[in-house]
C-alpha cells in the first residue's frame, strides 16, 4: 500500500477536526501548489470564515486570486487581511500585504 499524500493526510485531519486552522491552511496551500486554484480558494474561504484573524490565509488567497487574474478580489482580500493584521498586531503580515496591495493599485 502506498504512503498517503500530504493532501490525503490533511483531509484526514480535517475529517476529525474541521476547524483545524493549520490543516485547512495546509490543504489550501497543497491545492495552490498543484495549480488547483478554485479548490485552493475554496479552502482559504473556509479557513477565513472560521478563523478571521489567520493573516497568512488572506495573503496566500490574494496571491492565488492574482494568479487567476482576479485582481480586484485580491485587493479586497488584502484589505481584509490588513485589517486582521492590525487587529492581531502582526506587523510582518501587515507589511507584506500592504506592499502587495500597493503593487496591485
Question: Residues of each region from the PLM?
Answer:
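Canonical positions in the second alpha-helix
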Residues: 12-13, 46-47, 81
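Structural marker of alpha-solenoid helical repeat scaffolds
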Residues: 16, 50, 84-88
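Residue at a conserved register position within TPR or TPR-like alpha-solenoid repeats
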Residues: 31, 65, 98-101, 105
Amino acid at each position: 500500500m502506498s504512503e498517503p499524500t500530504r493532501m490525503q493526510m490533511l483531509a484526514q485531519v480535517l475529517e476529525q477536526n474541521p476547524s483545524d486552522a493549520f490543516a485547512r491552511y495546509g490543504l489550501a496551500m497543497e491545492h495552490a501548489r498543484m495549480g488547483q486554484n478554485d479548490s485552493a480558494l475554496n479552502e482559504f474561504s473556509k479557513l477565513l470564515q472560521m478563523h478571521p484573524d489567520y493573516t497568512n490565509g488572506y495573503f496566500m488567497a490574494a496571491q492565488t486570486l492574482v494568479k487567476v487574474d482576479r485582481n480586484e478580489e485580491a485587493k479586497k482580500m488584502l484589505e481584509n487581511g490588513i485589517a486582521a493584521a492590525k487587529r492581531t498586531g502582526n506587523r510582518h503580515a501587515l507589511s507584506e500585504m500592504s506592499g502587495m496591495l500597493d503593487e496591485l493599485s
